[in-house]
Design a protein with these regions (language model features):
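Basic, Lys/Arg-enriched alpha-helical interface segments
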Residues: 1-65, 74-79, 88-111
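Conserved catalytic cores of phosphodiester-cleaving nucleases, focusing on short active-site segments
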Residues: 82-83
Length: 111
């Protein structure tokens, strides 16, 4: 069995977001994360946002787009920190959500 290329850490907000979704949706989100952590390279599942250090886990379920924002921490071990999630309603990722993830990232590395 292949070793994961990163370990996912969920903030409380990201955890709450996933737990509040229907079980089938949260299962698919975790399934897609597991695929990416296992080494699958697929921009439909995990994509770096332009002009940012923020990435998004992308899940499509019943024509609804779910996004979980995240960033990398490779200091001691390879971690991906998931900051928060949204149910995407527009084509473009809302800039306020990217800014929120960037603020959480900045605070994380300050400590």
């Amino acid at each position: 069995m292949a070793q994961n290329i990163f370990r996912l850490v969920l903030t409380d907000e990201a955890q709450t977001f996933i737990e509040c979704l229907p079980e089938a949706v949260s299962y698919k989100i975790y399934y897609n994360i597991k695929r990416v952590a296992g080494g699958e390279r697929n921009k439909e599942l995990f994509k770096k946002l332009e002009n940012s250090e923020i990435w998004e886990f992308r899940t499509l379920y019943n024509k609804t787009a779910y996004r979980l924002f995240a960033f990398w921490d490779k200091d001691k071990e390879t971690l991906v920190i998931a900051t928060h999630g949204i149910i995407k309603k527009t084509q473009k990722t809302p800039s306020k959500e990217i800014a929120k993830a960037e603020a959480i990232r900045k605070e994380y590395f300050k400590n």
